[in-house]
């Protein structure tokens, strides 16, 4: 998927790509009524070369906040309007029960056309019906969604084997009433796919949202594709230096082949933090 977005970024060019980034509100505070909001980190346009253009196109090298994500996705699915988010709906006098102040939807700008928004809603619904978001599928309801994987940064460098797995969902996708953003910071002992981490949890939250908002069933949702196309991948744990029993516990999802004698792992293949598919074999050298 990333090479495809690199190609799209190149076709758009840096001026147009970063114009959309700006219009969707990234790199600046949303103005939400919460203290301590961050702006995120976006490249300055005059410092964007071919590498920065390519990495930005698939979401690496930049930093955004969850509320920016929600505001931007809301604009994608609501017909194209970026709105100022708010937490408090109104303030009520405790003695008189009268509304002192009320907060209403405040449109900031039109970012994309109604037609583009409609296409995107269909595409997001396809992700849940036929793609990596199938674990969020709820029969009778039109759910749109997109999985996400962000590599974590420490001391200015990307960390190996440390990720934020996320899932963004909208319900119902043809006439959105709610957007959900769910993230898990560095999930452990699980497949390296949001399809297996955040998406099943998101489905349970979506059921609560449907109940709370009394969203009605529809009979025109996209039919779920029952063939699972995603390959399950894992990050290989580091077991070098551990004893045989401890290594066996950490590698319980894999087939293990031992060589050498002794009880301490001195070498492993594949190396720690590499990505491998489910049912792969890991070879350990004991000493």
Residue positions per predicted region:
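Ligand-recognition elements built from short beta-strands and adjacent flexible loops
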Residues: 140, 154, 182-287
